[in-house]
Curated annotation (Swiss-Prot):
Residues 435-540 are annotated as: PFYRE. This is DELLA protein RHT-1. A motif (VHIID) lies at residues 338-342. Residues 225-619 form the GRAS domain. Residues 1-27, 109-138, 159-201 are annotated as: Disordered. It comes from the Eukaryota. The lineage of its organism: Eukaryota, Viridiplantae, Streptophyta, Embryophyta, Tracheophyta. InterPro entries: DELLA_N_sf, TF_DELLA_N, TF_GRAS. Residues 232-288 are annotated as: Leucine repeat I (LRI).
Length: 623
């Protein structure tokens, strides 16, 4: 057969039909060059040298495996959306050269994903940024309600992707033509992601020519999920769901909230965790399954446990205690009788350091009285008294005259000035008691009840303290629309979770000194429990409203206005507090990421460029 066409010249142009003149010309040219072409494949129109048969067979097997990596299988449900991402301008010339054709197919399947399209411009407002393990994602402050994001469909996981049963005419193409999602002129531009072009799945569809000739089975899609694209889709899905909630479009919100776990599963690290907590909070709000306040012994004990782990895992509470103690220590300079009122004593972890500093003071320690305020316990145990006993034992070991009183109050607004005065009558011959009031992450809870903050500040004024220390989250989660609050909290807690991830490798200063083999495991437990601690705050900010929403964080500027209107003025924190706080952070893993800044006499601690908590000190304004 080869000799019969020996005199024919030229080469095949691309036909695949048996018996065509172009096929004959191709086979003849190969024979004329002395190459042994497989006659069976040549009869079908494909030029394969006998010496290349093993290589071609191996490449075909690799191609079959690559096309099977999309998780498709028999009996799978159709998903026509995959075909819409294919381009129409990628042509593989000379498909009769089967070896080169298969090799080009493999290179296309293994090609890197196309560049991301620009995120949709949802409005003209300035966008913020959420950091994640995969990069930085822009957060538009609002989402257009007409956005096609409400039609968001999930990206199937490799184990759960489905094969289309009935492909449209668009899906069944000439097997010698392959489309990719990389061209701006392709049909995928008109059917990009439901995020308005913000993210796309990369889809490749192809079938080997021999298989296409022998079997008319439609080609199966291969899905390559890019985590950065999925991250952008995840952020926009969260924001679109929040806007649907704000507009009371519950059907759209319900559809979107079901997509968030699918998108979050493609992420890693902090982004996946924070998205899971926000997705849960949105689901609770959409389905009206609000978190109940701690009303059992187990819940109260668990909340205390989470607080203790958060203290150990990251420097935020340590920074709050250290800077507040430094301001109180300077205010108590030269005083012989001092009294501290702690609005949220918890386990009393703040005060051993202050007692120790007072014990080392030149001239000896003063007489120290501590009033600790805490909520009632569900089992009516006196947890406050147990904290007092531990502190009294510590004070005894360092020879500090110590007195303690615990005050049980459901809310700080229940306090009256007489409760904070010394028991019994003071000796007129003794030096008057100098009072300091301390509040760490407590003031913002008062904003849930109208007039409660003003009542508490009036009580504080009545006892005439020398100094009032206030530590609060540096965030605005208490004003604007629900979508504004949601966007701000998503930004804030994404940064907080990033800082936990960044500081998880080496733990806190206690691990450096102990050198225990169990330190890495303990650090991992602290981080997980700290994430749960923050997750509860997220749930309260997003899922709750009215008096139930107690996590009403405000910025330092807002607190400055509130305290100024109540008759207080700022006490500048000294340079010693700044220097020693910076030294403290150097002991933590990820210390390079933590930043201490001085802001109008106050100190803030943040992660990289984002402040997260702020310490301020106040005194009664002059007449």
């Amino acid at each position: 057969m080869k000799r019969e066409y020996q005199d024919a010249g030229g080469s095949g142009g691309g036909g695949g039909g048996m018996g065509s003149s172009e096929d004959k010309m191709m086979v003849s040219a190969a024979a004329g060059e002395g190459e042994e072409v497989d006659e069976l494949l040549a009869a079908l129109g494909y030029k394969v040298r006998a010496s290349d048969m093993a290589d071609v067979a191996q490449k075909l097997e690799q191609l079959e495996m690559a096309m099977g990596m999309g998780g498709v299988g028999a009996g799978a449900a159709p998903d026509d959306s995959f075909a819409t991402h294919l381009a129409t301008d990628t042509v593989h010339y000379n498909p009769t050269d089967l070896s080169s054709w298969v090799e080009s197919m493999l290179s296309e399947l293994n090609a890197p994903p196309p560049p991301l399209p620009p995120a949709p411009q949802l409005n003209a407002s300035t966008s913020s940024t959420v950091t994640g393990s995969g990069g930085y994602f822009d957060l538009p402050p609002s989402v257009d309600s007409s956005s096609s994001i409400y039609a968001l469909r999930p990206i199937p996981s490799p184990a759960g992707a489905t094969a289309p049963a009935d492909l449209s005419a668009d899906s069944v193409r000439d097997p010698k033509r392959m489309r990719t999602g990389g061209s701006s002129t392709s049909s995928s531009s008109s059917s990009s992601s439901s995020l308005g072009g913000g993210a796309r799945s990369s889809v490749v569809e192809a079938a080997p020519p021999v298989a296409a000739a022998a079997n008319a089975t439609p080609a199966l899609p291969v899905v390559v999920v890019d985590t950065q694209e999925a991250g952008i889709r995840l952020v926009h899905a969260l924001l679109a769901c929040a806007e649907a909630v704000q507009q009371e479009n519950l059907s759209a919100a319900e559809a979107l909230v079901k997509q968030i776990p699918l998108l979050a599963a493609s992420q890693g690290g902090a982004m996946r965790k924070v998205a899971a907590y926000f997705g849960e909070a949105l689901a609770r709000r959409v389905f009206r399954f609000r978190p109940q306040p701690d009303s059992s012994l187990l819940d109260a004990a668990f909340a205390d446990l989470l607080h203790a782990h958060f203290y150990e895992s990251c420097p935020y509470l340590k920074f709050a205690h250290f800077t507040a103690n430094q301001a109180i220590l300077e205010a108590f300079a030269g005083c012989r009788r001092v009294h501290v009122v702690d609005f949220g004593i918890k386990q009393g972890m703040q005060w051993p350091a202050l007692l120790q500093a007072l014990a080392l003071r030149p001239g000896g320690p003063p007489s120290f009285r501590l009033t600790g305020v805490g909520p009632p316990q569900p089992d009516e145990t006196d947890a406050l008294q147990q904290v007092g006993w531990k502190l009294a034992q510590f004070a005894h070991t360092i020879r500090v005259d110590f007195q303690y009183r615990g005050l049980v109050a459901a809310t700080l607004a229940d306090l009256e000035p007489f409760m904070l005065q010394p028991e019994g009558e003071e000796d007129p011959n003794e030096e008057p008691e100098v009072i300091a009031v301390n509040s760490v992450f407590e003031m913002h809870r008062l904003l849930a009840q109208p007039g409660a903050l003003e009542k508490v500040l009036g009580t504080v004024r009545a006892v005439r303290p020398r100094i009032v220390t206030v530590v609060e989250q540096e965030a605005n989660h208490n004003s604007g629309t629900f979508l504004d609050r949601f966007t701000e909290s998503l930004h804030y807690y994404s940064t907080m979770f990033d800082s936990l991830e960044g500081g998880s490798s080496g733990g806190g200063p206690s691990e450096v000194s102990s050198g225990a083999a169990a330190a890495p495991a303990a650090a991992g437990t602290d981080q997980v429990m700290s994430e749960v601690y923050l997750g509860r705050q997220i749930c309260n900010v997003v899922a709750c409203e009215g008096a139930e929403r107690t996590e009403r964080h405000e910025t330092l500027g807002q607190w400055r206005n509130r305290l100024g209107n109540a008759g207080f003025e700022t006490v500048h924190l000294g340079s010693n507090a700044y220097k020693q706080a910076s030294t403290l952070l150097a002991l933590f893993a990820g210390g390079d990421g933590y930043k201490v800044e001085e802001k109008e006499g106050c100190l803030t601690l943040g992660w990289h460029t984002r402040p997260l908590i702020a310490t301020s000190a106040w005194r009664l304004a002059g007449p």
